């Protein structure tokens, strides 16, 4: 699989959607929920706001954010793959009081009006875009001035020969792929290592964000620098 290929990435997430949440819990020992809440906390969400979840997947972040913007607000989740969106809509239907909507869409061309959102998150999505720089530009375009955004993803270690990178390789090859193999998804999760290798590191992410028009950008390592949170102000 070619990292960043839009059609292949969409097919990948359609394929893994039924097992995605279960594998996330197992592979992170549930810690992904904490990291995602840290991303949401950066937004300082308030009732009445319109928030955007780009590459929303099965909708777990969007549903948490929807609790924060009640009453009077709205959370819009966009994803290119239809199978995760079906799961997101089913989850939302069980919590029908939440102001959340899910649509199929392209993170590089959302179709939203300029300055539409009061805040946005993108979790494990920027790394999978064909053009991460263009993704950050579109993210900036749809945010009102002064709005906050958070981009959560795997962190590419700065030293490929260092201990952090060595642990990441061990984790991906000896834990992630074997567990995915049990679910019949070995090929899909083997893609992770290649996608991380081509993903911009922390310094480049900050630079790309500033070039995209963000006023502030900082990258915060999480989970012993295995994950990273790019915190942005439009």
Regions found by a protein language model. Name each.
Residues 133-148:
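A short glycine-rich, Lys/Arg-flanked "PGG" loop and its adjoining helix->strand segment in the class I
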Residues 118-132:
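A short SAM/SAH-binding and catalytic strip from SAM-dependent methyltransferases
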Residues 1-19:
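N-terminal, positively charged/glycine-rich alpha-helical extensions of SAM-dependent methyltransferases
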Residues 7, 155-208:
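C-terminal alpha-helical "lid/dimerization" subdomain adjacent to the S-adenosyl-L-methionine
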Residues 29-49, 64:
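Conserved alpha-helix/loop element of class I SAM-dependent methyltransferases that forms part
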Residues 50-109:
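Class I SAM-dependent methyltransferase SAM/SAH-binding core
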Residues 108-120:
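A short acidic, Gly/Pro-enriched loop at the edge of an enzyme's catalytic core
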Residues 206, 212-215, 221-234:
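Core SAM-dependent methyltransferase catalytic element
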